[in-house]
Every structure is written in C-alpha cells, then in structure tokens.
Curated annotation (Swiss-Prot):
One of its GO terms (cellular component) is cytoplasm. ATP binds at S8, F9, H16, G89, L90, R91, E99, W123, S124, F125, V126, S127, S128, S129. Pathway: Cofactor biosynthesis; coenzyme A biosynthesis; CoA from (R)-pantothenate: step 4/5. The record marks H16 as: Transition state stabilizer. It comes from Deinococcus radiodurans (strain ATCC 13939 / DSM 20539 / JCM 16871 / CCUG 27074 / LMG 4051 / NBRC 15346 / NCIMB 9279 / VKM B-1422 / R1). It is found in: Cytoplasm. The gene is coaD. Signal peptide: none annotated. Its cofactor is Mg(2+). Homohexamer. Its EC number is 2.7.7.3. Reversibly transfers an adenylyl group from ATP to 4'-phosphopantetheine, yielding dephospho-CoA (dPCoA) and pyrophosphate. This is Phosphopantetheine adenylyltransferase. GO terms for biological process: coenzyme A biosynthetic process. It comes from the Bacteria.
Length: 167
C-alpha cells in the first residue's frame, strides 16, 4: 500500500521527518507532496522550488519516499496517483480536531482514508512557523530541522546569522 504525506513544508522540520520516517516503514512508498494552500497564500518564506529541493535533500536517505507538488484538492491528487491513504502528523489535541474534520471530508468526497501518526513527544512543540521565527532572530534551530532546512534558513537569514556568528 502507498500513501501521500501532504503539507506546505515551509520548511520541513524534524517533526515532519519523524512522521515521514515512521510512515516510510508502514507503507511501500510515501509521496511527500508540497500542497498549494490558499490560506497561506503569500505567507511562504520559501518558494515552491526551494521547498521541493529542501525536501529532496532531506529525504535522500529514505529510498521509498518521493517528493512532488500539487495545487488543487488533495483527494484529486491522491486519486491521480492511484493512492488511497493520506498520512497526517499530529502534535496535540488541537491538531486532531481540525484534522479529523478534514479526514471525514476526504473520505466522503474521495473515498480516501487518513492515517494519523502522533509526533514524537520531543517534536510536539515544533512547527515551521516557530522555526522560522527563531531563525529570523539568528537562534539555534539545528535540533528542530534537518540539515537541508537549517542551511536554507541560514541562507534566508544570512545577515542575522552573520552578526551572531561574529559576536
């Protein structure tokens, strides 16, 4: 059985990688799909191409994981790919309420099942938004993101990191 792991991945975090790595042990193939999210329009730090490149680098050691992108309804993408399972990571109960609603809708309109994977406890506080904020101040992020994301964030916020490194 194959699955799709969708998200905006702006950037991919260690929490994403934890869920993805565990999903890669559960499914024959997992397609990490960078989705266009209309609610996040204009709020991405990284371009689509940058996010795809970061993900390709971060997932290079996972042979049954491939990276793709899509703009549209997730259930349409899942059907086009011949998949029937969506993987979603959960950090807290508040994530579950929202994800449960989406899972029910996806099953109703696309006959797609959703598998929830709880983030490891030590990643439950990590979000892409928080990582970007910490990075924007030159803070330490190496434990919260894979090396590819850290390098990309350091490039985006080079001026801030250069000042901290010189101090």
């Amino acid at each position: 059985m194959n699955a799709v792991f969708p998200g905006s991945f702006d950037p991919v975090t260690s929490g994403h990688m934890d869920v993805l790595t565990r999903a890669s042990h559960m499914f024959e193939q997992v397609t990490v799909t960078v989705m266009h999210n209309a609610r996040k329009q204009g709020r991405h730090l990284f371009t689509l191409d940058e996010r795809l490149e970061i993900l390709r680098e971060a997932t290079a050691g996972l042979p049954n994981v491939r990276v793709d992108s899509f703009s549209g309804l997730l259930v349409d993408y899942v059907a086009q790919q011949g998949r029937s399972v969506i993987v979603r990571g959960l950090r807290a109960v508040s994530d579950y309420e929202y994800e449960l609603q989406i899972a029910h809708l996806n099953r109703q309109i696309g006959e797609v099942e959703t598998v929830f994977i709880m983030a490891a406890t030590h990643w439950s506080f990590v979000s892409s938004s928080m990582v970007k904020e910490i990075a924007s101040y030159g803070g330490k992020i190496h434990e919260m993101v894979p090396p590819a994301s850290e390098a990309a964030l350091r490039r985006k916020f080079a001026e801030v990191y250069d000042k901290r490194d010189d101090a």
